[in-house]
Regions:
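DUTPase catalytic domain/fold
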Residues: 1-202, 206, 218
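Cysteine-centered metal-binding/redox modules
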Residues: 215
């Protein structure tokens, strides 16, 4: 069963749902609107390896916006930090965002009970689109749970995304594999490279990172 606006508000007041910052105007009929944070990232290598950490190149979006282009995966992040206790959160794109040809997640729309963090977005576009930090990007929907829970996400030792960060977090799929013999594994928490503000964030297909380039407002 999906929570109504009244039930979401009650859960926020009781602390079972935490949304920071919380804006009453963002509470919809049966959802809560979340916004795009200021950071975007792309993977450095053109071909990713599921068995190893994949470095990312991060940019901070300038005031004039940032152009997303087709054929490129972008990792974004929500402006809001959330916690969900006793419910299951789902993140879906807003209709107005979808009509711009923007997908905000590949397959990872469902959160777990006990998830306490910002939401990393796996963004792609059908056509070039200029986006802006702070724009509405998605909506959280909350489902009731049937039956008791043994371990919430925040208490699972195997949970890979418990470290709280307002930055996009790259895939940690490699933690599901044993490190290859003789391979000096990179730290899963330090796969980020910083770029100068105002970048374009594209990555060369052959694995060479292009220097981000801003596109000015037109």
């Amino acid at each position: 069963m999906i929570l109504s606006d009244t039930r979401i508000r009650e859960a926020v007041e009781s602390g079972r749902i935490v949304i920071r910052p919380y804006r009453p105007a963002c509470l919809g009929t049966n959802s809560y609107d979340v916004h795009l944070g200021p950071y975007l990232a792309t993977y450095v290598d053109g071909a990713l390896d599921a068995r190893r950490p994949n470095a990312i190149l991060e940019v901070r979006m300038p005031k004039e916006g940032f152009v997303l282009v087709p054929g490129q995966l972008y990792l974004g992040v929500t402006e809001e930090y959330t916690e969900t206790h006793g419910y299951v959160p789902f993140l879906e794109g807003k209709s107005s965002v979808g009509r711009l040809g923007i997908d905000i997640h590949s397959t990872a729309g469902k959160g777990d009970e006990g998830f306490c963090n910002y939401w990393t977005l796996e963004m792609s576009v059908k056509v070039p689109v200029r986006i802006y930090a702070g724009m509405p990007i998605g909506q959280l929907i909350y489902f009731e749970i049937s039956g008791p829970i043994e371990r919430g996400y925040d208490t699972k030792a195997s949970a890979k995304y418990r470290t709280v960060s307002p930055h996009p977090i790259p895939s940690r799929m490699h933690l599901n594999f044993r490190p290859p013999a003789g391979d000096a594994a990179r730290s899963p928490r330090t796969g980020r490279r910083r770029a100068a503000p105002g970048g374009h964030g594209r990555v060369a297909r052959r694995g060479r990172a292009r220097r981000p380039r801003a596109r000015g407002a037109r």
